[in-house]
Amino acid sequence: ILEKNLYGLDIDDRAAQMAGFAMLMKASADDRRLFTATDDAGNLQPPKLNVLSLQESKGLSVDELATHLAPFKVQRTTITALVETFEHAKTFGSLIQIPYALKTHLAVLPQVLALVKQSGDMYASAAADDLLPLVQQAQVLAMQFDAVVANPPYMSEKFMNCLV
């Protein structure tokens, strides 16, 4: 349930951490082996939560990312779409709509970026590290859900910036 059915997004890093912690504590009350589960090789396998803090793409250079990821067939248009989509992620949060052109690349992009990280190319690996959080949050935002529980914003008008 934790890994396949529950997803969470927040614009506040601490709120996302607390949500993940609360989910793990609630689950550990029902399953004492939650934190000691191992794979076939005996390695600890804690649950992988899908609770993310939305990250902005401010400061990322499309040119630099495209240059380092081009040898791995990561398209410049895909990088541009990711960077532009999440430029104001902390402001708009889950209101962000993932463009259809980007949705078509989201299925293979994590595997490609994992291969980039294993390639040994230091600059390409750093570019993949910069792009991976954006890909993960785009995947969650592109999904369709049967039920959504949302928290209304608490911001008063005097704190709203010009984008809102």
Describe the residue ranges of each PLM region:
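SAM-dependent methyltransferase catalytic region
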Residues: 1-164
